[in-house]
Amino acid sequence: MKRTFQPSKLVRKRRHGFRARMATVGGRKVLARRRAQGRKRLSA
């Protein structure tokens, strides 16, 4: 059985990047929550 994590910088950015988060209402809520927590990195 192959490993489930097959790293790809492009896929990582597209799925979890800042612009991907900003594109949806839910993603914006994610960023808002992380800002409220004081996270250093908001997204991938």
Swiss-Prot record:
PROSITE patterns: RIBOSOMAL_L34
Pfam families: Ribosomal_L34
Keywords in alphabetical order: Ribonucleoprotein, Ribosomal protein
Record bears the keyword Methyltransferase: no
Ribonucleoprotein found in the keyword field: yes
Signal sequence extent: none
GO terms classed as biological process: translation
GO molecular function: structural constituent of ribosome
GO CC annotations, alphabetized: ribonucleoprotein complex; ribosome
Domain of life: Bacteria
InterPro entries per record: Ribosomal_bL34, Ribosomal_bL34_CS
Residues in coiled coil: none
PANTHER family: LARGE RIBOSOMAL SUBUNIT PROTEIN BL34M, MITOCHONDRIAL RIBOSOMAL PROTEIN 34 FAMILY MEMBER
UniProt family annotation: Belongs to the bacterial ribosomal protein bL34 family.
HAMAP family according to UniProt: Ribosomal_bL34
The protein, known as: Large ribosomal subunit protein bL34
Natural source organism: Rhodospirillum centenum (strain ATCC 51521 / SW)
Lineage: Bacteria, Pseudomonadati, Pseudomonadota, Alphaproteobacteria, Rhodospirillales
